[in-house]
Amino acid sequence: MSMVYANIFLAFIMSLMGLLMYRSHLMSSLLCLEGMMLSLFVMMTVTILNNHFTLASMAPIILLVFAACEAALGLSLLVMVSNTYGTDYVQNLNLLQC
């Protein structure tokens, strides 16, 4: 494994550890998810460019579309929760309430 792949994999693992450790605020969870998506995008792009996969060149673009949708939904959830509860603590959320 080259150093580029190792660094990208390390960035993904650090984002995953941040997501698992800092679960108290919704904003920090969203930032860790964005870090994971960014490292996946870079890993896919580097792999496709190194292996000359011309048919799979659309996959990173599709991943970016899903990441943008995830970010938009996450930010709208953050705004809704902060307007309703006045804070962005994850433990205040009860998913059983309507």
UniProtKB/Swiss-Prot annotation:
GO terms for biological process: ATP synthesis coupled electron transport. The gene is MT-ND4L. Pfam families: Oxidored_q2 (PF00420). It is found in: Mitochondrion inner membrane. Its EC number is 7.1.1.2. Core subunit of respiratory chain NADH dehydrogenase (Complex I) which is composed of 45 different subunits. Belongs to the complex I subunit 4L family. It is an enzyme of class 7 (translocase). GO terms for molecular function: NADH dehydrogenase (ubiquinone) activity. This is NADH-ubiquinone oxidoreductase chain 4L. GO terms for cellular component: mitochondrial inner membrane; respiratory chain complex I.
